[in-house]
Structures are given as C-alpha cells and as structure tokens.
Amino acid sequence: MFSKFTSILQHAVEALAPSLPLQEDFVYHWKAITHYYIETSDDKAPVTDTNIPSHLEQMLVILVQEENEREFGETGPCMEYLLHHKILETLYTLGKADCPPGMKQQVLVFYTKLLGKIRQPLLPHINVHRPVQKLIRLCGEVLATPTENEEIQFLCIVCAKLKQDPYLVNFFLENKFKSLVSQGGPNAISEDVLKSQDSLSTDTGQSCQAEEPLGASGTEHTDLGDQPSHQMGDLSTSLENLSVTALPEATVVRPNQDYNLVNSLLNLTRSPDGRIAVKACEGLMLLVSLPEPAAAKCLTQSTCLCELLTDRLASLYKALPQSVDPLDIETVEAVNWGLDSYSHKEDASAFPGKRALISFLSWFDYCDQLIKEAQKTAAVALAKAVHERFFIGVMEPQLMQTSEMGILTSTALLHRIVRQVTSDILLQEMVFFILGEQREPETLAEISRHPLRHRLIEHCDHISDEISIMTLRMFEHLLQKPNEHILYNLVLRNLEERNYTEYKPVCPEDKDVVENGLIAGAVDLEEDPLFTDISPDNTLSNQEWLSSSPPATPDHPKTDGKTEVHKIVNSFLCLVPDEAKSSYHVEGTGYDTYLRDAHRQFRDYCAICLRWEWPGSPKALERCNLEAAFFEGHFLKVLFDRMGRILDQPYDVNLQVTSVLSRLSLFPHPHIHEYLLDPYVNLASGCRSLFSVIVRVVGDLMVRIQRIQDFTPKLLLVRKRLLGLEPEGPVIDHITLLEGVIVLEEFCKELAAIAFVKYHAASTP
C-alpha cells in the first residue's frame, strides 16, 4: 500500500514539475531503476510493489515521442543512450534473475513494446539483437509459468519483425561454435570452420568469435550508464546480494542451439494453454516461410524442428485406441489446427477416442499447412522427416500387421490423411510411401518389390469385405490427388508401349461392316482364350450383345465423330441383355442421368492433368514394343479380378470396385481411354481389357439367368428396394447375383456416359 501511495505521489510531482528535455527525463527514469537495486535490501517484494514498472513505461513513452518528433530513420539521443549504455543487456540480466519477483514479466513487456512501437529497425544493432537472443532463450524453458503469455507475445513480435525484414534472420542464426570447450580458446576453432560459419555470423560485418568472458563471480558485465565507479561497485554488490547472478553460459558446444527462437517456440507449442500453443504454431509458420536459404538450412539442420514435429505426430497417432470405428474416422468433422478445441460434454456425436483422433488430425493438418507455407528447402526437409519418422516408422508397421481390426483402423486413418493432405510436397512423400518410386513397367514376378504397395493392393481383394472397401476408398481418393506419379505408378507405366494390342495392317475389306453386323477383329467369345471354360452351347451369339461399328483406331481417323461415339456408347449400353435390365422400369434411371456427373468429373480431371503434358493421341504402334509381354499391373489385375466376380460379391464391394474403375476411365490419357473405354481395340493374345472382362461376366450371367425362375420380376423388386421404393420384405433368393446384375447395368451406363463426354470434349475446339 505504501509503495502504491509513493508511486501516485511521484506521478503527481512529475506532472507538476517543469518538463525536462527528453534525454534528461529518460536518464532520470533509468537511474531511478538502478538506484532501486543499490538502495533496497528487500529482494522478496514483488516488482508491482515498486516504481520499476512505471519507470519502464515512461522510458517507452519517451522513446516513442522522440521518434515521432524526428525524421524517419534518425536516431535520437534517448535511443542513442539506450544503445550505448546497453540498457537492454542490463534488463535481460535482471529479468533472468527475476529480481524483484515479477521482473522477468516486466522485461518481456518492455522488449515487446519497444520492438513493436519503434518504427526504425532496431534488431540490426548489436546491443539490441544480442540481448534479444538471450531473452529468447529464457522463453519456453518451463511450461505453464506466470510469464508464458508475455513470452509468446515477445516471440511473436520478433517473428513479425523477421517476416517484415527477412534479412534480419541472420542475426538469429547463432554460430554453434561461439560457445567453446572450456580448455580451448578462440584459436581452438580452425580457420576453415570459421569461414564455413560466416553466413551464420550473428554480428553484422564481424567475424565469428567467442562471446565475452564472464566475470570471476559469473555475473555478466552490464553498463548502467554514467554511474561513478564507486556507485557501479555498490550496484554490483547489491546485485550479488539480491541473487541477481546470471548462470554462466554453457561452455560446451550445443549442436542444436543455433536457432533458439525456433526451440523456444517449439517448447511453447506444448503449452497446456491452447491459445499459447496456437500462437507458438503461428510463429513457427512465419519462420519457415522466410525466403532466406540460410534460415531454411539452419531451421531444418540445426534445430529439432523436424524431429519434434514428427515425434509429436507419432505420439498422437500412438495415443489413438487400437480399434476405432472406420465410419467415425471417416465422418469426424473437418479439423483445423488452429481450432483444436473439443468438449466431450457438448458433443452429441461423441465416441470413444474422438478427442485423441481430433488431436492427431489437427496436428497432421498443422504439419501439412506448415510444409505448404514453408520455403522450399525447409518444406522438402520437413516432408522427408514426416515420411521417414512417421509414415515409415509408425504407420507402416500398423498397415502391414495381420490383425483384421488393426488393418481396418490403420487403413481408415491412412484414407483420412490422404483425403486431408493439401501440400504438394507432403503429398509427394505420401505417394512415395504408399506406392514407391518405381516407374518402369511391372512384371508379375516383381509385384511385391514395394512391400507396402503390394500389401495395400492385395487388401483390395481381402477376405474381409470391410478391409477391401476401405482400401479401395483410399485408392479412389488417392487417384483424385494432383500428383502425376500416382496414376503412372498404378496404371500408365504398364500401358506405355500399348503391347496389349495386336497390330494388324488394315486391309480394304476390314473397313466394311460384315453382313451380319459384326466388325472385323471384334471380340469373339469362342475365340477369346479367357472364355475356354464356357461351353459354345451356353454362349450367346455376338449379335445379341454387340452393336455394329466400323473399326475405330487412332491410326485410322474417324470420318464421322458423332457416329463413332454413338456406336461406342451403344456397345456399352447393349452389353447387358434386355432380360437382365431393370432400369427402364423405374423412372429417372436412364443413361442420361450419368452425363452431367461425367461431364463435371471429366472437367475436374482435365484441370488436374493439364500440367502433366500428356499426349493428345496414342503412341504410334510402329514405335511401340509390341513384342514385350503385357502385364496390366497389380492394381488393374486386382480390379479386373474383382470385376470378374461382380455377380458373386456383396453389393457394397461392387459399388466400390466400379467406382474406382470409373475414376480411372475419366483420366484424359489416350492409352487409358483406349484400354478401358474402346470396345474395338484389337487385344493381343492372352490380354484382357475392361470391356473383355465385362463381356465374360455377361456370358456367365446369361448362363445363370436361365436357371433362376421369375428372374426379371425378382430383379425389378431388388432394384426398387435398393432405391427405397419398396419396403424390405422376405429375403429373395439369389440376392447377391441380382444386386450384382443391377450394379453391372449401372456401371455400363456410366462407362457409356464417360465415353460420350470424352469424345464430345475431344471434338470440341
């Protein structure tokens, strides 16, 4: 109470006293602070019970007033006094000792306001950036301290200054050799090492050298202004009596202390106070985005940034429950790293592990955004660290395990982060993790060359339908990502030489349609090696399912584009025979319903693939290596195998398989279009295409239809139940087959719509 009264009385006296020149006023306030340490004997009283806060505030007011009265960039006498007499160094020492209690908080506030309110650049001054560096080291040492808010405010203003003037970062890239081994002096550092550190020198135009030695007592030397020598001695004695003895700086080389600003921010990201943690994350994001190459290099090589980011990601992943419902992982609300606030009591859709899941996804989102904003060198290093320390070190063992529940949970989490990632550089590392970096054509003998890729593709045909569906969904979303390597690794590298085709020089008679409506080189069930197990008596004639069309190959341009697309569309629409169709009995389920979606999706895919510079037409057969053995690749092999069993698989599995195949068909690459959407491609012996696989399914279907009584009415009833037009009733025999037929019909209509849209887009200028 007495100190507060004294403070009020002092303000009143100052208000009534005649105004002094600014410099005299500034020196007065500073000497008032130093006299406190000389005269006081009570080192336990909090700083708020002294006049120190008001004197510091008045010093700031004077400095701001002085700058406003002068030309921009001109240094006034008060600022000169502050710099020349190393006032910031002294304040740092007092703040480090926290004497009187609460002094550290006052020093942090003073530094923050000084850097924030003074417009002229202060950090280039050695008597500013050196104490700022030292004060940075005090931040984040202990979490949940009373000064945590002031610490983050101070660090953020430093980050803002660096963002404003990126060259200033060089003052905060500390030379790791500045702290020498105690028995060695400056000469212990070789000349070569010193030269290599020039770019990271902390002082403008000064060579790297050891920091000033400490006094015998360990107290850092500070200059308190124009104090008489005896008064300085009294002050030193007072500081020692008040325990204001800064601990000696470490005298050993600290390899990860080059960028203390980063280390302090990293510590504060773990603060229990969410607001502090978010501000620390924002500060790191400012630093990684600085364009200075030296800063990026130091950031990733001389700090623990990469390790701490990825280790936290790993620990949050490991904190997840062993089994989480995949639907919960897929449907949990979108997360944002800056809004990671969750209340279990307020959440009506809570589930076990939701808090842990949101924390993991939020931190992954932060890492993703950090890499997205980072300078390229830093971004690559950060992404590689996530790849090596998290993807390979933590996720891969989970994805490779044999427990079905573990596989399902880990695949669902992989699916979620595939959907969530937005950084191109992190996406690239994720793609390399999932698929590997191989780009040469696959061979059947080497499909397990990249174990994780092989395992994930095998999971698309897993005995567990849930695992199959989840893995197929993951690949479906992966295919939608803007990364050329995904499609090339999974499909395109195996179609590059077009060795799925059989090259036949065109004869004049091949251009004519034969009398019965067949075309030259059309697929024949009896001659197709894939149909040797079907009896000729049980197969349909080609006229019943294949519409007539002239040969259409890229080597022989179409004379009538509209006619060509009409015939190709009809080829898909007529694949399923009339007795197996049910859509025309239900209104609004025609082929045209797929056109709008196909147009939108194809437009989106074209926008993604535009920068990949794909050819507009297939590679000429004369330049293709048609002698090489064709293998469609592990991914298409599994999809085609699944497609071939469409009549015997659950409805949900069939929907997912056809969804992935339709996604592949949408890509505007001529080889993909030819292989998946051209019914009239001349397949080489032993090769199959999507069309030939469907043909075989239809052949099998027509044999099985004849064994089922009331097939068409049952089929229509199942369709209406699936659409919700009929209530659920008694179980229908052959329900899996009937649902498979419905999916097959819809898939053929979807392929027809995609073919139409792609041909229309190709013919439009």
Swiss-Prot record:
Coiled coil: none
Top-rank taxon: Eukaryota
InterPro entries (UniProt xref): FHIP, FHIP_C, FHIP_KELAA_motif
Ranges where the record places region Disordered: 200-234, 538-562
Pfam families the record matches: DUF5917, KELAA, RAI16-like
Biased composition (Polar residues): 200-209, 538-550
Family indicated by similarity: Belongs to the FHIP family.
Function: May be required for proper functioning of the nervous system.
Protein name, as recorded: FHF complex subunit HOOK interacting protein 2A
